[in-house]
Amino acid sequence: MLQIRVFNYNDPIDGENIVELRYHNRSPVKAFQIVDGIWIIPERYNFTNDTKKVPDDRALTILEDEVFAVRENDYLTTDVNEKNSFLNNITKLFKRINSSNIGNQLLNYISTSVPYPVVSTNSIKARDYNTIKFDSIDGRRITKSANVLIYGPSMKNLLDKQTRAINGEEAKNGIGCLSDIIFSPNYLSVQTVSSSRFVEDPASSLTHELIHALHNLYGIQYPGEEKFKFGGFIDKLLGTRECIDYEEVLTYGGKDSEIIRKKIDKSLYPDDFVNKYGEMYKRIKGSNPYYPDEKKLKQSFLNRMNPFDQNGTFDTKEFKNHLMDLWFGLNESEFAKEKKILVRKHYITKQINPKYTELTNDVYTEDKGFVNGQSIDNQNFKIIDDLISKKVKLCSITSKNRVNICIDVNKEDLYFISDKEGFENIDFSEPEIRYDSNVTTATTSSFTDHFLVNRTFNDSDRFPPVELEYAIEPAEIVDNTIMPDIDQKSEISLDNLTTFHYLNAQKMDLGFDSSKEQLKMVTSIEESLLDSKKVYTPFTRTAHSVNERISGIAESYLFYQWLKTVINDFTDELNQKSNTDKVADISWIIPYVGPALNIGLDLSHGDFTKAFEDLGVSILFAIAPEFATISLVALSIYENIEEDSQKEKVINKVENTLARRIEKWHQVYAFMVAQWWGMVHTQIDTRIHQMYESLSHQIIAIKANMEYQLSHYKGPDNDKLLLKDYIYEAEIALNTSANRAMKNIERFMIESSISYLKNNLIPSVVENLKKFDADTKKNLDQFIDKNSSVLGSDLHILKSQVDLELNPTTKVAFNIQSIPDFDINALIDRLGIQLKDNLVFSLGVESDKIKDLSGNNTNLEVKTGVQIVDGRDSKTIRLNSNENSSIIVQKNESINFSYFSDFTISFWIRVPRLNKNDFIDLGIEYDLVNNMDNQGWKISLKDGNLVWRMKDRFGKIIDIITSLTFSNSFIDKYISSNIWRHITITVNQLKDCTLYINGDKIDSKSINELRGIDNNSPIIFKLEGNRNKNQFIRLDQFNIYQRALNESEVEMLFNSYFNSNILRDFWGEPLEYNKSYYMINQAILGGPLRSTYKSWYGEYYPYISRMRTFNVSSFILIPYLYHKGSDVEKVKIINKNNVDKYVRKNDVADVKFENYGNLILTLPMYSKIKERYMVLNEGRNGDLKLIQLQSNDKYYCQIRIFEMYRNGLLSIADDENWLYSSGWYLYSSGWYLDNYKTLDLKKHTKTNWYFVSEDEGWKE
């Protein structure tokens, strides 16, 4: 691990790692070498040829290239404490970066190389501008190579974070250069993931800048001219953005770099560019420097390049792969992934007001980053009071009253899409195909996977940048910053109201005093724009429920019920979804998006759903995108008389052409994906942010009305403290509903974006590609015909191959999964994503430790009497009936639900069957999970049934009891049966609570009268109140979600636990090979499996005898599962695949009866009906397939027999008296096999087989 040096600003100069640096011919500054080649300079950055000066009136002016700015001239200029804090903060970030694999590799790369020197026959020298100068302790002037200098923010803006190449050309052409990094660790941007907002981790953003510096150092900054250009047509409401270099997108990494990857692969490093690296390597190898330092420099370069020296020849292919590793393996996203840091989904994203924080140890550590997480709710993140931003005035005349309405909008909030110019003039031509052409196949593998798995990082694996020509040292510094021209127009006149007017109409004025005036919610946009006491809402019911109370509520209960009504109406309207099958690949339409954002309101009488169905996805676009066209030229084959006389080379040329054709299709697809991303998806992403803003405005307006009602409350004054709590909880409930709705909105928007790509853009190029295919086929046919005499018998094969692959009716399929992420997988597994997003607590076992597996690291105490045992999938928790067998979970805000906060609890539980020892507990309720003092909730057991109880602060109690009996629910639902049951309890505090077992609804009760079940008590997992001290329970995956799942989601949640192909035994645990089981039939529970020898047939016949039962009380009758006796058979399933110990669906195995051998079909020597009966035989294999023809959540399986014409399912004979025996013989039923899927499975159970292992939870 690289050693990070630690300094204080007042440490004395040592002339080695702490120096007084003279740089850019400026006054000396104190610099600290944190690792070799990287220096920290705790000063403001003021070394630039930028002629734009910071205005004196800093509070009112923002420069053209900025979105947000903070002006402060004094910071980091004279205060030693500020300088020391800056130095310590950067050091902390370096330690955090260095603690990751990627970060450590990055710092090693930077610290073990220098920009490529000037090379001649007898000399190797560094360029002067890539060095720093300082005085040694003894007064000598020292010149030393340097790679990176890290400064504080620039003089013009404290929010600056950027990397400047000291020579912009040499950063791209292979020579390489030193970099200045401008950085502020305390001012942090705010980003979004889904509907959540978070603050960037400064270690992640510093890593981003260091990667830029690495590219500059090696001279491999993206050399192409391609940029994402953003139009400046201000009359179209297009925002003003800098051009985004592909260098920026690739340095960030993530999904966006994958999208543009195929588009840039070809131009990234042309072969002649890489070949020159080999030439430079030879030049260094052949030089003969005189001075020791130069010899050492030469040897270090040779050591770094040796991995690419293959027997004296420079391996350009391997070197190019190495460059690609650096490009696609080292990026900010991969660093964030390794450190589990939240980062934005896309490089280009809406910027939100930044935050300020100190990086003290109680706020930020090297290991965890932000101790309390990155959410903007973290109180350590402060609002920046003196933040300024660039605005534009939008003016429009209303349609009804003809009033000119002007609003101020941040330019950052305007739309931005890629300019078509950035995609034009792309060369899709190809050189003539040769027999040895290097053709790459389309792949979806990750460069990062290759990078991390296949690269070993040590000094010999570094490589220096290589000059293309002998360099002439420039006389001045080149400033490489892009400063685009921006339209300075500050006011825009428009014909109609825009989305921004609608959003502004939903916003409460900053100066509005909600304690004195009521803010009315109205459904008229013009009424709102003309009256500051009104806000616009697209939600009619919500407006009615908010406005119906003028003022003067006189009772706390009435106030509470009014809050509930408002929340309920708002939530119901947010949950609106219109299912549709009229627009391809769209699951549903969110109908209020139109009226919220003024989309399509002039169409279909304001019906957004109908307008969307009629016009499609394009209705969402604020600006109609203009796409660059593609010009394709047919592939041609290089013809050479000598080569074309060789059959193998002719065939290679044809095959390479066909492979290149596939590559071309994928290249064109990738080009269209890049345009879609820059012109369509950016607009869709803006729409998502606009809806987030809209719902936020709605909540603010609703809360303002609540505060108004509180200030005008006519009841007792001592009620107001309680009412404040109600309002606080109501705001949480409103935000929860909005976040939930945003997930539906986001899905609708993302599906719309992908639909446009699949159904509009991709088809638009297919006809062009088919013409390309036809022209290419013509060239191939001519080439094959010309060389038919050489091909001989392969002529027909080659022609058939061309005809097949270039058939006009075929095309190369576009793989939607090739679009990196974009939530496609999330859309497919939306329930899983939603549950993960809402999971706030998950008690389980990991690495033999009981912990919170949700990622929230909830504090819990596990007492010594709690055991970890084998469970439903792996290890699970066992609670015993003793004082030390308990788990105490300290509650945090995430799991403290009150008033209006919905939640769901789900868990797996295995409770032993009631036996005689349990009689002393009959009629007694005892606790399993308790979070109740004077109020709260708990889960308990009574007479083998589960009890869910809620109690509010006024003592009102709601109970749900399963009320099942053993006899009618033993297999499926009864809790005390020793079988794993999945319990789900949903609590919708505005309506009801519901209890489910195994995904099926058992009971539901209204909880509308309950008023607050929150408390500060811990959640205690403990058997408390029972008399039987031998009792125990097994508990697994106890999860709490911060929303109430609906009925279909509960069913899906239960089914999600059965995605594996592993079959399960009678108890619900994995079925295992070579383990002893009793095998019982569902039709005759309690009927033991026996065998009998029939001498006249010479075989042992297995059969099931009559059911045997026993009583544990006068009202509970229980079937025997364990059977004793010399003729009772236990079985083992014998593995034929040797994969692992678990039995999976469709495994072929032997069912071995422990006494008499394998279960097989009788030999075909008796009557036809008897040939289908099963016998036991030591010498023959049964080759039975264990299958599951019903849903995966069943704890039984079917057994299929394969035997010539007697295929069937293992069943029991209808005639119990066959062979004069009192029982049911086993046979192969072809009828059941043919008809199983059409049968009433509640009646037809004879082919369902359980495997029962002996367990301490079931005693007989």
From Swiss-Prot:
Which catalysed reactions does the entry list for this protein? Answer: Limited hydrolysis of proteins of the neuroexocytosis apparatus, synaptobrevins, SNAP25 or syntaxin. No detected action on small molecule substrates
Q: Where is this region: HCN?
A: 825-1065
Residue ranges, annotated region (Translocation domain (TD))? 401-824
Pfam families in alphabetical order: Peptidase_M27, Toxin_R_bind_N, Toxin_trans
Here the disulfide bonds are C395-C406
Which stretches of sequence are listed as region HCC? Answer: 1066-1260
List the GO molecular function terms.
metalloendopeptidase activity; protein transmembrane transporter activity; toxin activity; zinc ion binding
Q: Does the keyword Zinc apply?
A: yes
What regulates this protein's activity? Preincubation with the metalloprotease inhibitor 1,10-phenanthroline before injection into Anopheles or Aedes decreases toxicity.
> What biotechnological purpose does this protein serve?
Identification of mosquitocidal P.bifermentans strains in regions where mosquito-borne diseases are endemic could help control mosquito populations. No mammalian toxicity was detected.
| Further information | Feeding larvae with P.bifermentans strain Cbm (subsp. malaysia) is toxic to Anopheles mosquito 3rd instar larvae and less toxic to Aedes aegypti larvae. The presence of 4 plasmids, including this one, is required to kill mosquito larvae.
- Protein name per the record: Paraclostridial mosquitocidal protein 1
Q: What is the lineage of its organism?
A: Bacteria, Bacillati, Bacillota, Clostridia, Peptostreptococcales
Gene from which this protein is expressed: pmp1
